[in-house]
């Protein structure tokens, strides 16, 4: 391919609205162009990267027996209403009416459609298991698209679905896909973590995320470097370090004027926030709850969402109507009308301070073990430095991009959609299902987040738009054509920068775009070719007959 005929335009300055490194470089290197908020066109360079990633994904899915198909993007509301997700997705789903006033959506995911199809096509256990996948554009009306290709309203995703007659069969396929995802990420040059995760709106009994460490990541992950425990913040558990030892004071009601916040109480009593016991009042699934949690911790929203179908904080009026004083709440005698949940964050606390249910008063010296409760729960946020629940070593945290997510769904979709098969004993049973997603467009950004320097993108060999850029200097067209033919015949993608520009401009663009190998053919070098490897910066001067072998040997490390 010749640059003089290529559809691109590089930029010297970062776009003003771009925050993420990958977003800046994708725009500057003419990989993508924004069409609207969260909507991008893939230009030829970016398109080639996208298709190379798709090829890797396709090869690994085919390797484990996946069958590629294409489902419709446009779906009727009925199937979504059967699973309850027409309402659950809310404004994130792009909905519309056709000319007959029938409700439709643009698919954000395809569990409903594939389950309906399976119910129509699979009738016997003899046809199980099945694994199908597609690589397709999805649509979600994100409230705040950001970071270029990281949070989009229109994106390419590989989604796969499996159907089984037993949990054992599901586990086998789940593990096969998990390992396939590992190979995909390794082949495209990514460092990653496989972490226990929250199933979220997809649902199911078990899920894992594939997290690529990155500064602009929207996922927080906690990891123990001693035993390998790793989980996202939504499902992570920990053991809190005990606060510094303090002799327990006598149980006493203490006047604490104008101290309705945890910080105020701690400062007034000259104690750390760890010693304060919060009593958080919520309405969960239409019932009142008091959640006791250590004062230096907040409730984790994802954990609360798993505990309750719907929940919210009580208003001051609601708290008063139940006989409690806002800002000074604590357990009291005879409160049978409310369920008390005691959070695990209190396990490391021997004594503390809690509201006295009287304005401007707290009770000091409360034995935590004697607090009344109905159930012990894990609803508090985990923090860096907490102790690993498996081995007791400190946890560290890092941010990352979720690039893949796999789920054991069970019968979450097959039951409401009445997708059944006949078992070996003739019984009619719902399919046991798994689903498996990997964000193809997000992988483009993830690769750049991990592979760039001050000069631009450093593409791994496997996904580079072109493996080699040839930069001619002087009258060397015959030599360039011969090199181009030799490299192309060996299966390499070759880009010739034949623009009428100074060599320095071409060198800057070569680094920005991120070609793994740069060849400079200079009329003054008497048949020698300068080879520069983008990743290492290594530069060699070799005869033209040695270029192919030198490039292929160097490619092993790119």
UniProtKB/Swiss-Prot annotation:
SUPFAM superfamilies: Class II aaRS ABD-related (SSF52954), Class II aaRS and biotin synthetases (SSF55681), YbaK/ProRS associated domain (SSF55826). It is found in: Cytoplasm. Its main location: cytoplasm. It comes from the Bacteria. It is an enzyme of class 6 (ligase). Its EC number is 6.1.1.15. Catalyzes the attachment of proline to tRNA(Pro) in a two-step reaction: proline is first activated by ATP to form Pro-AMP and then transferred to the acceptor end of tRNA(Pro). As ProRS can inadvertently accommodate and process non-cognate amino acids such as alanine and cysteine, to avoid such errors it has two additional distinct editing activities against alanine. One activity is designated as 'pretransfer' editing and involves the tRNA(Pro)-independent hydrolysis of activated Ala-AMP. NCBIfam families: PRK09194.1 (NF006625), proS_fam_II (TIGR00409). Belongs to the class-II aminoacyl-tRNA synthetase family. ProS type 1 subfamily. Homodimer. This is Proline--tRNA ligase. The gene is proS.
